[in-house]
């Protein structure tokens, strides 16, 4: 069952401007070390970070809170699976909110898709509740 849906559209040039004005202070406030390491290896750092910004915004909307209720930017981290597929790792208040909205007997899965076409970066997040594996075969 779908627990939450969120989307966000971010202007890459806006993020580039913030990076130019605030540099590492902005980077450290919003992004995890893993996200920053990935962006540092990419040709277009601003586009990479703009997609992650959009993903965090979209995830906060899917959680039903926005960036409120104690959820911070770093509580939501975009990771990439081996094949490059993005996924979202939640910690802190974001993880607590996810646990609170997940029905008993289910586990949450956060689906993430990212795209960019200059000057826009977009993210879409769907939070799904899946039956626990132990109960999947019972009816």
UniProtKB/Swiss-Prot annotation:
Keywords: Cytoplasm, Fatty acid biosynthesis, Fatty acid metabolism, Lipid biosynthesis, Lipid metabolism, Magnesium, Metal-binding, Transferase. InterPro entries: 4-PPantetheinyl_Trfase_dom, 4-PPantetheinyl_Trfase_dom_sf, ACPS, Ppantetheine-prot_Trfase_dom. This is Holo-[acyl-carrier-protein] synthase. GO terms for molecular function: holo-[acyl-carrier-protein] synthase activity; magnesium ion binding. Coiled coil: none annotated. The keyword Heme does not apply. It comes from Paracoccus denitrificans (strain Pd 1222). Its cofactor is Mg(2+). GO terms for biological process: fatty acid biosynthetic process. Gene3D superfamilies: 4'-phosphopantetheinyl transferase domain. Mg(2+) binds at residues 8, 57. Its EC number is 2.7.8.7. GO terms for cellular component: cytoplasm. Its main location: cytoplasm. NCBIfam families: acpS, pantethn_trn. Transfers the 4'-phosphopantetheine moiety from coenzyme A to a Ser of acyl-carrier-protein. The keyword Lipid metabolism applies. It is found in: Cytoplasm. Belongs to the P-Pant transferase superfamily. AcpS family. It catalyses: apo-[ACP] + CoA = holo-[ACP] + adenosine 3',5'-bisphosphate + H(+).
């Amino acid at each position: 069952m779908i627990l939450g849906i969120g989307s966000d559209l971010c202007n890459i040039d806006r993020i580039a401007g913030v990076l130019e004005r605030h540099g590492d202070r902005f980077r450290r406030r919003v992004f995890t070390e893993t996200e920053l390491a990935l962006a540092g290896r990419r040709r277009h750092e601003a586009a990479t970070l703009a997609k992650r910004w959009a993903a965090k915004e979209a995830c906060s909307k899917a959680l039903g809170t926005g960036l409120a209720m104690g959820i911070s930017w770093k509580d939501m981290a975009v990771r990439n699976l081996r094949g490059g597929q993005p996924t979202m790792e939640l910690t802190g208040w974001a993880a607590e909110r996810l646990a609170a909205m997940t029905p008993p007997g289910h586990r949450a899965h956060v689906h993430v898709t990212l795209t960019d076409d200059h000057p826009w970066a977009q993210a879409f997040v769907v939070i799904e509740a899946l039956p626990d594996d132990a109960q999947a075969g019972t009816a």
